[in-house]
Amino acid sequence: MAERKYFGTDGVRGKVGQFPITPDFALKLGWAAGKVLATQGSKQVLIGKDTRISGYMLESALEAGLAAAGLSAAFTGPMPTPAIAYLTRTFRAEAGIVISASHNPYDDNGIKFFSAIGEKLPDEVEEAIEAMLDQPMDCVESAELGRASRINDAAGRYIEFCKSTFPSHLSLDGYKIVVDCANGATYHIAPNVMRELGAEVIEIGTHPNGLNINEKCGATDIKALQQVVVEAGADVGLAYDGDGDRLIMVDHLGNKVDGDQILFIIAREALCSGKLHGGVVGTLMSNMSLELALKELAIPFARANVGDRYVLEVLKEKGWKLGGENSGHIIVLDKNTTGDGIVASLEVLAAMASHKLSLNDLAKAVPLFPQVLINVRFAGGANPLDSEDVKAVAKAVEQRLAGKGRILLRKSGTEPLIRVMVECEDGALAQSCAEEISEAVKRN
């Protein structure tokens, strides 16, 4: 794969107003993508966004660039990332564009593309767009310019899709659910999905103003959700992130239920109904208790690198359908082509309704082992993980933890940091082992 100049692992991302998240670059990116996609067939591209104020600026610039290349843009307005993947497929568009920086603060933004089948663009298409970005911009003849339109019922279409994934013989009638939409893209979707399936819904994080996305709310900060669930006597709390591809849950006692526990609940339910199709993919950070719980059910488990795109890669390699991260990215390939927070929450709610069990009961099967994370800064140059001293200490710790814990040592890809993670049923032992390895890293 060629070295990338503009695209990262998840499209283009950065601070608004700084390259590449500027209106002039977005214009050029729209044009370059349009020139490449125009050779593929369809002349329509969907553009969706989350609720950041900069989304208005970037969608206009992208649309102008696409039009100059002869492609038409259809705006969905604020929509979750998985909704754009779904709508791109159903509209038979050539591509979908999402303007979002996911769980980041409002002054970040990003631009990423979906293919016609709602998946990440093939590498060769991204590389062709990168090459086109270095060419001088031109404009098609006036009669061939693209047009702009708005899909007025985009939210309704996606709401119906989400509801269709919930078993028709079940209902959420009698459930009180607190929904935290992070003041993000699910604000007008998730509460309506739950209500239309019968639930009593209490909303938080559903008043976006362009500046408050992910601010003290959503999947990355669930304190407010935990408080409201307990105070309201709710059955469950659902927290999505800014673009709706993550889910963290809260049980009726206010306990956090993370992506590993959610993944297990969905996997066990799929196994019982004969719909599992192979095993489950987690990541290097997935809790050991998830692996052990799946092993008890004889469900195969594989670990991918951290990042939902790597989970998806391993799922495709193995032909499996279910994977995710402890951060709450849950991919159910039977239902959508990318991580989908609302669909994942409906999978868990269906398990609750089907067995008449609380979320607390379902999550008990995966009592998470304590994870101790220590970031150790080093001077740069040689990688401390290559040192014989660090290797010897790590090996000794692994022997001490054999069968009851694990270690993970990673060098940061962006900073001079070594990330030390120790996981063990005994939290005090995990802490002492992590500190021992960290001291060895500091010495080297």
Swiss-Prot record:
Modification type Phosphoserine: residues: 102
- Active site annotation, chain numbering: 102
Gene name, Swiss-Prot/TrEMBL: glmM
Q: Which family does it belong to?
A: Belongs to the phosphohexose mutase family.
Q: Which HAMAP family match?
A: GlmM_B (MF_01554_B)
Q: What is its EC number?
A: 5.4.2.10
Q: Which transformation does this protein catalyse, written as a reaction?
A: alpha-D-glucosamine 1-phosphate = D-glucosamine 6-phosphate
Modification after translation: Activated by phosphorylation.
Cofactor annotation comment: Binds 1 Mg(2+) ion per subunit.
Q: SUPFAM superfamilies from the xrefs?
A: Phosphoglucomutase, C-terminal domain, Phosphoglucomutase, first 3 domains
- Name listed for the protein in its UniProt record: Phosphoglucosamine mutase
**Tell me, which GO biological process terms does this entry list?**
carbohydrate metabolic process; peptidoglycan biosynthetic process; UDP-N-acetylglucosamine biosynthetic process
InterPro entries, per this entry? A-D-PHexomutase_a/b/a-I, A-D-PHexomutase_a/b/a-I/II/III, A-D-PHexomutase_a/b/a-II, A-D-PHexomutase_a/b/a-III, A-D-PHexomutase_C, A-D-PHexomutase_C_sf, A-D-PHexomutase_CS, Alpha-D-phosphohexomutase_SF
Keywords noted in UniProt = Isomerase, Magnesium, Metal-binding, Phosphoprotein
Which organism is this protein's natural source?
Answer: Glaesserella parasuis serovar 5 (strain SH0165)
